[in-house]
Amino acid sequence: MSKRLAALFAMLFAVLVCLQTPALADGLPVAMIDVANTANGYYKADGSEGTSSDYCYKIEDARILLSKTDVVYELTGLTNKSVTIINSSKPTDAFNIRLNGATLSDGINIQNSGYFTRVSVETAAGSSNTVNKLIARDLTISGAGSVNAQYVGSSGGADAKLHITDAKVTVNVPTNSNEFNGACVIDGSAEVRFIATKDYAPLQVENGGSLTLKDGAKLYCLHDNPNLASGSYVAGLEMFSAKLRLEGNSYLEAEARPCTNPDYNGDAIVSYGGVDVLDNAKVVARANGAGLNVGALTVSGEGARIDAESKAASGVAADSVTVENGGTIDASGSWQAIYSRGDFKAGAGAFVNLESGGCALWAEGNLAADGALIQAVPNKDVALFSKGDVDIKKSTIIARAESGDEAIRARGDITANLSWLDLKSTSGEGVTGTITNSVVFNNNVGTVIGDAVTNVNNFIDRNASLTIPEGASLIVGDGLDLRNDGVVNVLGTFNVGNGTLTCLNHSGGLATCAAGPLCDLCQTEYGVPDPTNHAHLEHVEAKAATTEAEGNIEYWACSGCSKYFADAAAREEIEQASTVLAKLPEQKPAGNNSGNGGGNDNGGDKKPQQAANKKGTKSQLPATGDALNAALPLAAALAGVIVIASGFVVSKR
């Protein structure tokens, strides 16, 4: 009796567990099915025996039939039987399946597949599952587990839907391409891989459909042997007229196969409905054909990026190309890196980096850059070409035409304003057009035209020189850095403004006897002083000495080195003391002490000369050998003699 009670309690506990197992979003009850160990028959959701009129699922020799939309079928174990959904004619009702370590060798199939059937498949957290195929008119795959399959898709026409969120899905495509129909969305943290093993694209999105990647979702369209040449055209992601859109931090990677006939090399991504890469999304495409062969292409967002590589065609071929708001295209091709069948536009913050065998960027329409940075390096041909006009504003263009062609060429007009053009052309002319308020380098020799302002963090190469002519000016843009490792000759005006200057190589200026030269660009002293260059030489005129003040000879004094020179060329250095003329001594009055003007009416019997030369009287001549200074006392004495003689004659009369 106790054994029977224990068994009964165990059965009741199992039923309660089944009824209380967490379910999908609607909180539905869960029907636990071990697909490997269930006998044939009708079963209710709790696993008890049912009938043909009230069963939840039915086990047959070749099938496991699921008939209810108001439960969650949680499948575990391995089976070769087909898990078949008995289709509901109510498209609003979804069949809910949770995979929890299940291996379904024949996949999940739809009975009466012509109806619009909604199927929601959840992968239990941490579980690994294998399902041969998952297909429905409206299919959702979710959860924190993984599923391996040979086919996953939405069936039907444009009204079909596919949504993969969070789950990890790997599809090894054994034959024809896997196919999406209608609106297809991959989002959350989903990681989806399609790997082709035959000569077909891993994934196709049919006409009238669309594919959108959001959040942090990742999609890979790969081949198990991508370098093996096929006998026909084999793409990576083939979308025909369907539109491709990437948002958030989503990621797409696609590759194509080469062909034994190079004219039919596969393209990595084909979407004539257009491609939008937005926000922080990224696309990586590689092929022998085009990396991307698409309709209108837009790359917009600070982290939005396309990396496209073609070994035998164009990296990007598009009906039109727009890169803006910080978007990036990094493309390479053996033909063009970018071939636009219409216009090409690079807007604010755009970065375009191109390497190619032929022309790096070819636009059948107009080519415009406004606030962009474009680097273009072709092995031959021009760097940038437009059949229309080229209009460059507030942009930096680094273009290298290595084969003798112009760096920039157009059949229409070429204009550039407030831009930085770093061009190289062995033909001698980097660009011919109307250039205003810009910096233009041609083969590393640059000049500033008008009033230029930098628009990105520009760099002057070690082998380059830049001249700012008189009347021209260069200002570093707000928040930007100008990095100089070349030679800059400032004849006009340079201003750091609200930017910064990193000067790695100083040039210009003149060294003086007191200091090394000042860099033309940053005004930093560098090098060593020049002892022969007395830039601060002051001329001092000669001044005669007087009894009141000293005089000086003519000389030149340098305030830079505090030296004195006898000539204007500063070749003959002299001592400062030798420039000084001594002050003259004071002169005593001539005659006796009575103050008589020299007359001898008082009977004076001595001549003035005798008095002056009286023994013991010191000479009044200066000690120096200056002839002028020595003659002054003699002239005074002679004048005295004349006066006395005149007085004597008068008295005789």
Placement of each model-derived feature along the sequence:
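Extracellular modular ligand-binding repeats in secreted and cell-surface proteins
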Residues: C503-G591
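A composition-driven surface/loop motif
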Residues: D26-N505, L521
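C-terminal membrane-anchoring or membrane-association module
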Residues: A635-R653
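Bacterial N-terminal signal peptides that target proteins for export
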Residues: M1-F9
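Sec-dependent signal peptide cleavage junction
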Residues: C18-L28, P622-A630, V650
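C-terminal low-complexity, Ser/Thr- and acidic/Pro-rich disordered "stalk" regions positioned immediately N-terminal
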Residues: A582-A627
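Cellulosome-associated attachment modules in secreted, modular CAZymes
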Residues: V476, L628, L634-A639
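Bacterial N-terminal signal peptides
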Residues: F9-Q20
